[in-house]
């Protein structure tokens, strides 16, 4: 029986490259030169932005988003927290989200069921497995999911006949 998985994954090397590019871009900006830093924590997949003022944090966040787009990483996976003061500096944390949580998985399953396609969707941890009798039905399900807007970037992998 043909099937595929709906997942939300990040290429960690591309994320690292995007953060490195953002650091280089920050050094090139004369208005932010020496006034802000990016600190990337690989294990937690977080970036700590540090600057003197809050508007500089916003500019740094925009630099990071542009670097992600250049590396073809969807910006929807970046979750930012509110800026906070730490001594004379302002700090903000940005986390890269990965995997499909329960609420999003339920939305995906509901979208597929509302589409009245001849496929079944089942939640399996941080992914959704979609099975059907024909390959064409699965391709319709992929097309349906691509038309909908979700709060995480979705990838379709493990396509089996």
From Swiss-Prot:
Keywords: Nucleotide-binding. One of its GO terms (molecular function) is nucleotide binding. Pfam families: DUF520. The keyword Amino-acid biosynthesis does not apply. Disulfide bonds: none annotated. Gene3D superfamilies: 3.30.70.860, YajQ-like, domain 2. Belongs to the YajQ family. NCBIfam families: PRK05412.1 (NF003819). This is Nucleotide-binding protein PSEEN4469. It comes from Pseudomonas entomophila (strain L48).
